[in-house]
From Swiss-Prot:
PANTHER family: MBT DOMAIN-CONTAINING PROTEIN 1, POLYCOMB GROUP PROTEIN
Residue ranges, compositional bias (Low complexity): 29-41, 586-596
The keyword Protein biosynthesis appears for this protein: no
Organism from which the protein derives: Xenopus tropicalis
CDD domains from the UniProt entry: MBT_MBTD1_rpt1 (cd20120), MBT_MBTD1_rpt2 (cd20123), MBT_MBTD1_rpt3 (cd20126), MBT_MBTD1_rpt4 (cd20129)
Annotated S-S bridges: none
Gene: mbtd1
Protein name (record): MBT domain-containing protein 1
Subunit structure comment from the entry: Monomer. Component of the NuA4 histone acetyltransferase complex.
């Protein structure tokens, strides 16, 4: 009977397509405002038997358990998020609800599943099974909550845990985000074009009571990185149904996509009776308007293809001894960020995160070629499946001719402290390497064996000539233990018998980066490089940016170059499936302030991270996209030569 009805609907749909030369309202005519309950709503309102508070029931891995006293231990599966009785969980550690979840976690299938969904691929068979579990998890949480209330005999409101939303954060703080064009290393960074306010797209219509997925046209009201605040056509100045979405998401399309894909365009029911002829309204509104290029989704997909692959071997800085490099193997690639596992790590827990364009990674043999210190790896531990990453994959540094007036050992300069990125310090050139590389030491805090010397290229934007901080009104950190304050370079050079490095040898190029003070972005905490956090640009000195991590003290700020591959547009984590660290709660900030006053970071703990990572929990951000297009008559588009397309009416 159901099949007969579907065939009849399909036949009726085909007939309407023949009558309508535009093909726009193929789903609208047959979907008049019908307030009768749909099959989808019937399915969603599934009856669930109430759970007695005295005898909560937990279904775990196919088994049903009860705990009359409500005191039995609970556990949450680290793979699928299922809540259940701890004793029924798998393995001694009770971290997983089943053998399947344990193995899936180890094989990193969760990450692959997330990336597949973000890229618009259909879910795997396992993913479909996991989608059925949230109901069980809710039942378990409800049962645990009821049991807790009974034991405490105190009426307390449940704590609501909400995920961080960039859209709400931008709106509530009335701030702006750095545009995607500021990040050339990010997806679409080089082809963002004229994607701006006013561009029209087609997205799912969420203001509809129809049982099927329908679409409507929206305009970009505000841009925040990859995210856009959209407003449905027809709402004029009414912002009541405005919503945020990621423009690069799988549900966002150029105007014309619905017509070519046979998807219905249906106006939101809130304004459904505002116009009698919606077709004429859209033609008038959209003729001459801009939309996304037809191959926009293809460009997004192509920009998220990365040349580095798992099992590739590279040389990377040793996070325990900054003066040397070690061999590491690419374990995974997310959004261009590499998780590198040091080759001699047997349990694969000794790792390091960086972007594929980072100056901290190099091809195998780089250290030997320039005279850099290198920790040798036991050749017996090298796995046959690993292979050296091709040299052309790495970022090329500027070719420099080291003449007679080149940097020399003992010369003084100013440099960002790699162990305290909020400080620019008095520094000394300790060794001159080949190809323009220098080993730099921070005066007053160097290890006796030079293990904390750091390698900077002469063109690095992280080293500066003597006097840079004074000229730009930046606080210069004097050598530890130096008592003649305020610090004066002239006196210090005379006392140490040193000379300043020539100003002409430093990088003076300042690109038109587009950053402005107050702009929001996502930034890597370089002291714990696996974390990407909500951040703000608080100061700009030429090409140098002062990055503040929202919710944390200023002492955690970091100086970063404007072209750093550790900065990303708002929405990058959501797009790539990476985990975004939200601003720290005020309580954590206060406690952290007290801790920081009592205990300063030790110089012997490089890249261990600030205390803030103990208070933050990694949270998965799921992509929430929306799709957009237009009628066939307006699907003919003209490129304006700059990335966006104009919509023209068919003659």
């Amino acid at each position: 009977m159901e099949k007969t009805k579907d065939l009849a609907d399909l036949s009726s749909l085909s007939e309407r397509k023949r009558r309508d030369s535009f093909g726009m309202f193929d789903g609208y005519d047959s979907c008049s405002e019908d307030t009768s309950s749909s099959s989808s709503s019937d399915e969603s309102e599934e009856e669930v038997a109430p759970l007695p508070s005295s005898l909560p029931i937990i279904k775990n891995n196919g088994q049903v358990y009860t705990y009359p006293d409500g005191k039995s231990g609970m556990a949450t599966c680290e793979m699928c998020g299922m809540v259940g009785v701890r004793d029924a969980f798998y393995s001694k550690t009770k971290r997983f609800c089943s053998v399947s979840c344990s193995r899936s976690y180890s094989s990193n299938s969760k990450k692959a599943s997330i990336l597949a969904r973000l890229q618009g691929k259909p879910p795997t068979k396992k993913a479909k099974v996991l989608q059925k579990k949230p109901l069980v998890a809710k039942l378990a949480a409800y049962a645990q909550y009821k049991a807790t209330l009974k034991n405490q005999s105190v009426n307390k409101a449940p704590v609501t845990v909400e995920g961080f939303s960039w859209g709400n954060y931008i709106t509530s703080n009335n701030t702006a985000a750095a545009p995607v064009t500021c990040f050339r290393h990010a997806p679409m960074g080089n082809c963002w074009g004229d994607i701006a306010e006013g561009v029209r797209v087609e997205v799912p219509n969420t203001d509809s009571n129809l049982p099927t997925k329908v679409f409507w046209i929206s305009g970009i009201v505000k841009l925040a990185g990859f995210n856009a605040l959209l407003r449905y056509e027809g709402f004029e100045n009414d912002s009541s149904l405005d919503f945020w979405c990621n423009i690069c998401g799988p549900d966002v399309h150029p105007v014309g996509w619905c017509a070519t894909s046979g998807k219905p365009l249906v106006p939101p029911q809130t304004i459904q009776h505002k116009y009698t002829n919606w077709k004429a309204f859209l033609v008038k509104r959209l003729t001459g308007a801009k939309t996304l290029p037809p191959d926009f989704s293809q460009k997004v997909s192509e920009s998220m293809q990365y040349p580095f692959k798992p099992s590739m071997r590279v040389e990377v800085v040793d996070k325990t001894h900054l003066c040397r490099t070690r061999v590491a193997v690419v374990d995974s690639v997310i959004g261009g960020r590499l998780r590198l596992v040091y080759e001699e790590s047997e349990d694969k827990t000794d790792d390091f995160w960086c972007h594929m364009y980072s100056p901290l990674i190099h091809p195998i043999g780089w250290s030997r070629s320039i005279g850099h210190r290198f920790k040798r790896t036991d050749i017996l531990k090298k796995q046959e499946s690993n292979y050296d990453a091709p040299s052309h994959l790495f970022t090329k540094v500027k070719d420099i001719e080291q003449g007679s007036e080149w940097f020399k050992e003992g010369m003084k300069l100013e440099a960002i402290d790699p162990l305290n990125l909020s400080a620019i310090c008095v520094a000394t050139i300790r060794k001159v390497l080949a190809d323009g590389y220098l080993m730099i030491g921070i005066d007053g805090s160097e290890a006796a064996d030079g293990s904390d010397w750091f390698c900077y290229h002469a063109s690095s934007p992280s080293i500066f000539p003597v006097g840079f901080c004074e000229i730009n009104k930046i606080e210069l950190t004097p050598p530890r233990g130096y008592t003649k304050l305020p610090f004066k370079w002239f006196d210090y050079l005379r006392e140490t018998g040193s000379i300043a490095a020539p100003v002409k040898l430093f990088n003076k190029e300042v690109p038109n980066h587009g950053f402005r003070v107050g702009m929001k972005l996502e930034a890597v905490d370089l002291m714990e490089p696996r974390l990407v956090c909500v951040a703000t640009v608080t100061r700009i000195i030429h090409r140098l940016l002062r990055i503040h991590f929202d919710g944390w003290e200023d002492e955690y700020d970091q100086w970063v170059d404007c072209e750093s591959s550790d900065l990303y547009p708002v929405g990058w984590c959501q797009l790539t499936g990476y985990q975004l660290q939200p601003p720290a709660p005020q309580s954590n900030k206060d406690s952290q302030s007290n801790i920081s006053k009592q205990k300063k970071k030790s110089k012997s703990q490089p890249y261990k991270g600030h205390k803030k990572i103990t208070a933050l929990q990694l949270k998965d951000e799921m992509l929430d996209g929306d799709d957009y297009t237009f009628l066939q008559g307006a699907s003919d588009q003209e490129s304006n030569g700059s990335g966006s397309y104009y919509i023209k009416q068919e003659p």
